[in-house]
C-alpha cells in the first residue's frame, strides 16, 4: 500500500474512533465519516468494505493491548479456576467497555473474519491450553463453545433479557466449563 493510502486509512480509523466515542457507533454512518474527512464514499469503501469492517480495524489497537494483558493472567495466577475466573472478568469487562463496536463487528456480513482473526485465535489458544486433555477434538469443541458463550450477542442477551448479573454470568460459565475438581483447586 502506498504511503498516502496508509495515511488516509489511519486518518479514517482515527476520525471514526473519535466519532464513535463521541456519538456512539450506531449513530454514525459511513456517509458521515466520509463527510467529516472531506473524502468521497469511494475512497472510504476502498479502505473498508462496510461499517463492520471499519469497526473491526478501529478496535484493533485495543485488542492488542487486551491480549498482552490477558496473557499475563496465566503468569499471575496458578490454579485453573483462578486463571479462568480472572480471565473471564477481564474479558467480560472488555466486552462491556467495547459493546457497540463489538456488536457492529458481529452484525457484519463477514462473520468468519472474526473467527479467523488473530484475536479469536489468541482467545482460543488461551482457553484451549486451560482445557487441554487427551481428547483433542473435545478440547477444541469445549473451547469453541466457551467462546461462543462469550459472543457479544449471547452475553448481551443474558445480561439485558435474562437479567443475569455479570458476576452470575461468569460463575455459570465457571460451573459449565470447569469440572468440580478444577473449581476446588
Swiss-Prot record:
Domain annotation HTH tetR-type: ranges: 6-66
Database matches in InterPro entries: DNA-bd_HTH_TetR-type_CS (IPR023772), Homeodomain-like_sf (IPR009057), HTH-type_Tx_Regulator (IPR050624), HTH_TetR (IPR001647)
Pfam families membership: TetR_N
Keywords: DNA-binding, Transcription, Transcription regulation
One annotated GO molecular function: DNA binding
Chain residues forming the annotated DNA-binding region: 29-48
The protein, known as: HTH-type transcriptional regulator SAB2452
Amino acid at each position: 500500500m502506498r504511503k498516502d493510502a496508509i495515511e488516509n486509512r489511519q486518518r479514517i480509523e482515527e476520525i471514526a474512533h473519535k466519532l464513535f466515542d463521541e456519538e456512539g457507533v450506531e449513530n454514525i454512518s459511513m456517509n458521515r465519516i466520509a463527510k467529516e474527512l472531506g473524502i468521497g464514499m469511494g475512497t472510504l469503501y476502498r479502505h473498508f468494505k462496510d461499517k463492520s469492517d471499519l469497526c473491526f480495524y478501529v478496535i484493533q489497537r485495543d485488542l492488542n493491548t487486551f491480549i498482552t494483558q490477558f496473557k499475563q493472567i496465566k503468569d499471575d495466577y496458578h490454579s485453573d479456576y483462578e486463571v479462568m475466573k480472572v480471565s473471564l472478568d477481564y474479558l467480560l469487562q472488555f466486552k462491556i467497555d467495547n459493546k457497540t463496536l463489538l456488536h457492529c463487528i458481529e452484525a457484519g456480513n463477514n462473520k468468519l473474519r472474526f473467527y479467523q482473526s488473530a484475536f479469536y485465535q489468541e482467545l482460543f489458544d488461551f482457553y484451549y491450553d486451560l482445557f487441554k486433555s487427551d481428547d483433542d477434538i473435545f478440547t477444541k469443541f469445549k473451547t469453541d463453545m466457551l467462546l461462543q458463550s462469550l459472543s457479544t450477542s449471547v452475553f448481551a442477551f443474558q445480561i439485558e433479557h435474562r437479567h443475569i448479573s455479570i458476576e452470575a454470568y461468569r460463575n455459570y460459565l465457571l460451573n459449565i466449563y470447569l469440572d468440580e475438581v478444577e473449581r476446588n483447586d
